[in-house]
Amino acid sequence: MIDKTAFIHPSSIVEEGAIIGAGVYIGPFCIVGSQVEIGAGTELKSHVVVNGITKIGCDNQIYQFASIGEANQDLKYAGEPTRVEVGDRNRIRESVTIHRGTTQGGGVTKVGCDNLLMVNTHVAHDCVIGNRCILANNAALGGHVEIDDYAIIGGMTAIHQFCVIGAHVMVGGCSGITQDVPPFVIAQGNHATPFGINIEGLKRRGFDKESLHAIRSAYKLLYRSGRTLDEVKPEIAELAEQYPVVKAFNDFFARSTRGIIR
């Protein structure tokens, strides 16, 4: 079903069965598959391919040569009907690739809302990207990676499969991430190590002095006390009772499967 207010350039192919919302713009030389749904106001600039069982929300801007919903690169994948879901108001720049999920990983690759995926970003099968994240040029996510809200991933950074990147994290460019990065932390290097708290980013997002102090205290316990994670977890949990913002650390530890960067 194609809304009557949608524009489709004559050189583009929209297969029968695709759902195209109001005010959608599909520019020259695009291909949209039969199981694709594109929400109102989304723009495909030109030469965009959207394939597979893919749902794209409203008011997204998708630039030249982006590929969304194509078969993933997992060698176990045998054509199962897995999906891609993209939220609203994302900017997906040139040559970005977002691959469909696998049955082993839940069957869906997800991108939230208000994200910026810069040129050549790769989002592999079963990744989950939150809201208001920035992935700079040539950032590459392995399968099953989770990127929490407001995280910034520097250009040319590679993230190993199954890693979790916490909320408000900043990862410097050309880094290699092989373990999980706790919330609020700056990480840099190959292999990445912690470089303090993302103070400027937190200030811009309205964190008050008390919250910043509490986050610093948790960071010092985690990285400067000379103790193991299991040893400091109870103290961080106590700190979270007084300062709710610190609870983000506890929630993160519960999700972490690869250990945290050191």
Curated annotation (Swiss-Prot):
- The answer to whether UniProt assigns keyword Lipid biosynthesis to this entry is yes
Q: Which GO terms describe its molecular function?
A: acyl-[acyl-carrier-protein]-UDP-N-acetylglucosamine O-acyltransferase activity
- Entry's InterPro entries? Acetyltransf_C, Acetyltransf_C_sf, Hexapep, Hexapep_transf_CS, Lipid_A_LpxA, Trimer_LpxA-like_sf
Q: In which domain of life is the source organism classified?
A: Bacteria
What GO biological process term is on the record, naming one? lipid A biosynthetic process
Its EC number is 2.3.1.129
Query: Which reaction does this enzyme catalyse, per its entry?
Result: a (3R)-hydroxyacyl-[ACP] + UDP-N-acetyl-alpha-D-glucosamine = a UDP-3-O-[(3R)-3-hydroxyacyl]-N-acetyl-alpha-D-glucosamine + holo-[ACP]
**UniProt pathway annotation:** Glycolipid biosynthesis; lipid IV(A) biosynthesis; lipid IV(A) from (3R)-3-hydroxytetradecanoyl-[acyl-carrier-protein] and UDP-N-acetyl-alpha-D-glucosamine: step 1/6
Residue ranges of coiled coil: none
Q: Which UniProt keywords apply?
A: Acyltransferase, Cytoplasm, Lipid A biosynthesis, Lipid biosynthesis, Lipid metabolism, Repeat, Transferase
The answer to whether the entry has keyword Phosphoprotein is no
Q: Where in the cell is it found?
A: Cytoplasm
Q: How does it assemble?
A: Homotrimer.
Which HAMAP family does the entry mention? LpxA (MF_00387)
What protein family is recorded? Answer: Belongs to the transferase hexapeptide repeat family. LpxA subfamily.
Entries under PANTHER family matching the protein: ACYL-[ACYL-CARRIER-PROTEIN]--UDP-N-ACETYLGLUCOSAMINE O-ACYLTRANSFERASE (PTHR43480), ACYL-[ACYL-CARRIER-PROTEIN]--UDP-N-ACETYLGLUCOSAMINE O-ACYLTRANSFERASE, MITOCHONDRIAL-RELATED (PTHR43480:SF1)
Q: What is this protein called?
A: Acyl-[acyl-carrier-protein]--UDP-N-acetylglucosamine O-acyltransferase
Which species does this protein come from? Yersinia pestis
